[in-house]
C-alpha cells in the first residue's frame, strides 16, 4: 500500500474555518497530515477538527487573528504544547476590498494590507523556525488578481501582487535551507470570500456574484493545490479559466483591456 503523500507531516493552515482553507485541511488530513487549524471563528474550527478526527485524522483548532501581533506565535506555542512542529505553513487567510479608487479611503487600503500582506508576513515569520529546521514548505495563497489588476479591485490586486513578490523573494532566500516556497494563484473558487465586506466582516446572506458555471469547488481546487505543494512547485495557477486569463493577459494584454472597457468595474468578482 502506498504511503499517504503527507504522512507524518504537520501543516498549519490559516483561514481554515471555511472555503479553500477548510478544503485544504480536509485534503491534507486525508493524505496523512496532522493539521493545525487557525482562524478567528473558533466554533467553526472546532467543528472541522471534530469532522477530521471522526474520519481518522488528527487536528488541532486554534483561535487566531492574523492582524494581531502575537496571535500567530501563540498558535505555534499551542502546536508545540501538543507535541507538534510545523513542516508546512499555508498562509491562506485573506479577504477582498472592492470599489473604485475614488470611493475607497486610505483606511480601506490599510485594512486590506493588514490582512492580506502583513497577516501573511506574521504567519510565515511565526512558523519559519519550525519549517526551516524541518526543511519544509512555505505556501502562499495568492490569486489571479496578483497577475492581472482590473478596475474596482485595486486594493485587492495590490495585496496579491505584493505576496507574489514576497513568494519570489523568499524562494531565493530559503532555498539554501532546503525550504520550498509555493505560490498558489486561484481563479474563481467557491468560497465565502465574496461574502466578506470591505471591513472584513462576513455576511452569510450576501449573494454569490460569480456565475455558477465559472466556479470550481473548493475541494477540487484543494486537490490541485496539494499536488503542487507535494511536488514543491514554484507556482501554480488553479482553475482552467484562471490559467487562461493569466496566459491571455501575459501575451495579449490589449485584448483583456478592450474587454474590460466594455464592461463594468469588478465588484466582489474576485478569487
Which sequence ranges carry the predicted segments?
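Substrate-binding pocket helix/loop in short-chain dehydrogenase/reductase
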Residues: 100-101, 105-110
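The beta1-alpha1 cofactor-binding region of Rossmann-like NAD(H)/NADP(H)-dependent oxidoreductases
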Residues: 63-74, 106
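Residue(s) in the substrate-gating loop at a strand-loop-helix junction
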Residues: 143
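Active-site helix of classical SDR
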Residues: 124, 159
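Conserved glycine-rich Rossmann-like NAD(P)H-binding loop of the short-chain dehydrogenase/reductase
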Residues: 33-48
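SDR active-site lid
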Residues: 175-240
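Conserved glycine-rich cofactor-binding loop
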Residues: 10, 17-18
Amino acid at each position: 500500500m502506498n504511503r499517504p503523500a503527507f504522512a507524518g507531516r504537520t501543516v498549519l493552515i490559516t483561514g481554515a474555518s471555511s472555503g479553500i482553507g477548510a478544503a485544504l485541511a480536509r485534503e491534507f488530513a486525508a493524505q496523512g497530515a496532522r493539521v493545525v487549524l487557525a482562524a478567528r471563528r473558533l466554533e467553526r474550527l472546532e467543528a472541522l477538527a471534530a469532522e477530521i478526527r471522526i474520519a481518522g485524522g488528527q487536528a488541532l483548532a486554534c483561535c487566531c487573528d492574523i492582524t494581531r501581533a502575537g496571535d500567530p506565535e501563540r498558535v505555534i506555542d499551542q502546536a508545540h504544547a501538543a507535541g507538534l512542529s510545523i513542516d508546512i505553513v499555508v498562509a491562506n487567510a485573506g479577504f477582498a476590498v472592492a470599489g473604485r479608487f475614488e470611493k475607497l479611503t486610505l483606511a480601506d487600503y490599510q485594512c486590506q494590507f493588514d490582512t492580506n500582506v502583513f497577516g501573511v508576513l506574521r504567519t510565515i515569520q511565526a512558523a519559519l523556525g519550525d519549517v526551516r529546521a524541518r526543511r519544509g514548505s512555505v505556501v502562499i495563497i495568492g490569486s489571479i488578481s496578483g497577475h492581472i489588476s482590473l478596475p474596482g479591485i485595486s486594493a485587492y490586486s495590490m495585496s496579491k501582487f505584493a505576496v507574489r513578490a514576497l513568494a519570489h523573494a523568499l524562494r531565493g532566500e530559503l532555498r539554501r535551507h532546503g525550504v520550498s516556497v509555493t505560490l498558489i494563484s486561484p481563479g474563481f473558487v467557491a468560497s465565502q470570500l465574496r461574502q466578506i465586506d470591505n471591513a472584513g466582516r462576513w455576511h452569510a446572506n450576501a449573494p454569490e456574484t460569480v456565475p455558477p458555471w465559472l466556479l470550481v469547488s473548493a475541494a477540487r481546487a484543494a486537490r490541485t493545490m496539494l499536488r503542487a505543494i507535494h511536488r514543491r512547485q514554484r507556482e501554480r495557477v488553479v482553475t482552467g479559466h484562471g490559467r487562461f486569463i493569466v496566459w491571455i493577459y501575459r501575451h495579449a494584454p490589449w485584448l483583456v483591456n478592450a474587454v474590460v472597457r466594455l464592461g463594468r468595474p469588478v465588484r466582489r468578482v474576485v478569487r
